[in-house]
Amino acid sequence: MKEREKKYIALWQVMQRECRRLVSRPLYLFCMVIAPLFCYIFFTTLMDSGLPKDLPARVVDMDDSSTSRNIVRNLDAFSQTGVVAHYSNVTDARIAMQEGKIYGFFYLPKGLSAEAQSQRQPTISFYTNYSYLIAGSLLFRDMKMMGELTSGAAARTMLYAKGATENQAMAYLQPIVIDTHPLNNPWLNYSVYLCNTLIPGVLMLLIFMVTVYSIGVEIKDRTAREWLRMSNNSIYIALAGKLLPHTIVFFIMGIFYNVYLYGFLHFPCNSGIFPMIFATLCLVLASQCCGIVMIGTLPTLRLGLSFASLWGVISFSISGFSFPVMAMHPVLQALSNLFPLRHYFLIYVDQALNGYSMAYSWTNYMALLIFMMLPFFVVHRLKEALVYYKYIP
């Protein structure tokens, strides 16, 4: 019993020591509280409208007829497209697009109205700048739809002139009606699409960095032996006492972003907020354990931080929220399982979007649990580094 009490006392002393270190260095306050809060507010307010609106586009109207002006007005009525000016020739419009003043332009050739009425199939052209993927894609969608609507309106007018009824004309123009229902994010809101993974990803990256730094700085400042002596030379007590205060702070920050996203901003959360809070706790613990592995594998502060930053940044690309993993190379599909953010993203899709039970995502929870077990493979190497390694500036 006395031995167990000594362990609890040692754990408490290490936690007190770490709390003193946390409040004595502003870097911890910035990385654990200020930076996450800034990212929460920054990303959610950056895309608060959901989709970009009134993207600047221009029109080259060589026809200048009532038909062409009606087309321009209808194009400007789309919420994503804002017709800001007219050009008299294609060259000026192309130069403006290359200079970044507009994201695209719509070209209406001379004689458009006359050729449409005489069934000579005039050609409408539109150009979008895909150097800006989102802006180019949205303008392309609006301009393509406007071209299809213009073609359909011309054909409908011709059918009416031939005596067809409205039902006959619509059956000819659209023999099959498509009823589209986007699932889980019916508003096509980019904030819902990105923030639910970007914000946990930023928190995960900060956990990597803070965990590596808090252990690596003990080696750099030559206080590692003092830290171990306070923990009765137990690396497990030393790590638990050091990282438990971090866990509490980061978990509070995780609860905050869940309440902020699903309670305040009302993002889709079909299974309730508590499964997502539990997934956040698993992500925090898995990220801390990955940080231990990083500094245990490379027990140098600069190399450990480089490892943490590289692994964290790659997580955003390979987790699958921006580009589907199933479309990646098979090797990358396998490697994606080595990143905690990937499993958190899959849990988010199952729980928040699809509303499945937690049992449906058991493989992803098991993967996060495996990440929590990884430090057992490096703790002895890490202890040797804490005792014998000499930091070389």
Q: Which residue ranges define each predicted feature?
A:
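Hydrophobic alpha-helical segments typical of transmembrane helices
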Residues: T67-I71, T211, T223, I347
